[in-house]
């Protein structure tokens, strides 16, 4: 390069022009090469070890004069890289160490009392997704629903955006509507009042600079390009009542076996596509970065669902190290746990659930959490080992309840589908299946009791991701302790606890010697009615006695005449 530079002015101009073009490409194409930067960041320790080993091997190879030594060096280098691959990737030791780093950096807190659930959602995520897609036209797609807090209530929100099937629409069209559907209603409606007209110039299905991922990456500074990556996109209202896109960010931490953590959010305001908007997107990107420490200053981001599920899953999975570093290894596994995967259930844990921590006295907020039900690591074991509660707003805290050490003997999520199917054998379970068993914790008959709430859905034979749930689905509550199944009315959530008690009170009373509950106090009118009925019954009985006595006298007189 130096020789070429010194040849003359023409060559210097070419070099300068080439450097300008290269810098321009590096600046404008940040979103294209950022995955490569993240790859280096995630595996930087392994890459450095490989580079050092390769450097030493090549240097010694060049210094060696004999063929035998060179063959020996080649053998050692090959053996090293082969062993590195098998240990780190084939046997997943790299992921093992990454998860252990997550565990060591977790702010864990064991709770001694389960929180109550509130604002139970009726429909599972995949049902909502299918019903939303049934409500849009050929040229529109619906983004994956997320449960968020909007105007003080829990809502399923998703964008109505140009379909990915037609590229031209993804280039020129905006995202112009958002679905916002109540999660607590048994019959969600996707009509006009739940279709919010709001325009975003970027979207998850749009192309090039108008894609949400690309626009957010362009907003990252050079340091963040190496350490942050966009994740899930949520739609909610900000503190001014305007609809915004909130993109959850993942931050990679650590040098030895880097691990993902919550990195804050990027908030993208609504607005139509304009030329100035285009210039902003391709140069500095879109969005306002809010760090985890600053999120407490924004009310709409507190007690909210903004945490990437990729991060929360790894945090929950890391609890397998509660028994020590070596406990999850194949020859131990005394307390190792896993996140269960239910067959045919497309929505894997976590289940975003609204919890009330007010009576636990641990200082945790009441609101949306990512809930996990961890089970023993063996496939044949389905007991509930831990309930894990991770604040959905990214608060640096993890709460867990240890069912196993308390020897409660609760059944886990994996055991629920078969129990529901066994309770109603007349169902066509070949096309229907109970899905998404989320926790239902209430005070019934004098103490907290844990159930799992499942919804029966019909899954398409041709497309396993297409769920068809009725507007008023069949719901089943399974007692995690007694294993009994209670079928409840989706339209009357206020009666669920009483329905549970009516079915299970005999078992509870015989086992726990509890008092009688749900006994209704009679009103004055009902008491007067009972008295009147008693008087009428007594009068009828007296009349019958007089009739019998009259008949007896007639019989006696007939006998005397004879």
Question: What is the predicted function of each stretch?
Answer:
Residues 3-562:
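Soluble extracytoplasmic regions of secretory-pathway and membrane proteins
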